[in-house]
Amino acid sequence: MSNVIVLSEDAAEDIDKAVKYYDELSAGLGIEFISTLDIYFSKIAAVPTASAIRYDNVRVKFIDSFPFTIHFTIAPDNLIIILRVFNTHQQPFW
């Protein structure tokens, strides 16, 4: 059985804000951000344990092409819960 990605409300809000920001910056950049996230979500789903545990059983995956990190946990029943998608250039991060 394959892993299933589930977005928390906070992660969905983080993504919405980032897409709006990137679309204001340049037409189509928000879509590129979403496409990049899809690729990284697939990588996480394929091998979730490849990302290191950084704090409180939360794993972090760094995105190469955008200044963001994906924070997630591995739950029972093959669920991967995306907790946050943080912009590493903004403070505070939480």
Where are these regions (language model features)?
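Short acidic-hydrophobic surface loop/beta-edge motif
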Residues: R59-I63
